[in-house]
Regions:
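Non-catalytic surface loops within mature trypsin-like serine protease
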Residues: 11, 21, 44-46, 82-84, ...
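Short, basic, helix/turn surface patches
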Residues: 22-31, 91-98
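Residues in well-ordered beta-strands of folded domains
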Residues: 16-18, 41, 91
């Protein structure tokens, strides 16, 4: 689905850059010139945390773009949009655990 580059910014904080086409495909959205040209990802400690945060976002009225599910790379993630339509990924990545 495209090459992704990870940068360690500080302990517990990473920057991931990948093509817009890959992001749109992963989130299940059409590729358009919108605020979804990027996403903010919040990495959590386990799948239960992903589900809890996604439920919290939904209860607050956030549109759930992609419900949490297992990923092709071995993690677990879902997407929602905030009131400004920014795309948020809530993700458990076992490779990022300390």
């Amino acid at each position: 689905q495209g090459t992704v580059a990870f940068f360690d910014l500080q302990p517990g904080l990473k920057l991931a850059l990948w093509p817009r086409q890959s992001l749109a495909a992963d989130a299940g959205l059409p590729l358009t010139a919108t605020a979804t040209a990027m996403s903010l990802a919040h990495n959590v400690l386990n799948e239960t945390d992903v589900d809890a945060i996604m439920q919290q976002a939904s209860m607050a009225g956030a549109p759930i773009v992609k419900s949490p599910r297992k990923t092709f790379w071995g993690g677990y993630a879902g997407y929602f949009q905030d009131p400004d339509s920014h795309l948020w990924e809530i993700v458990w990545n076992p490779d990022f655990l300390p």
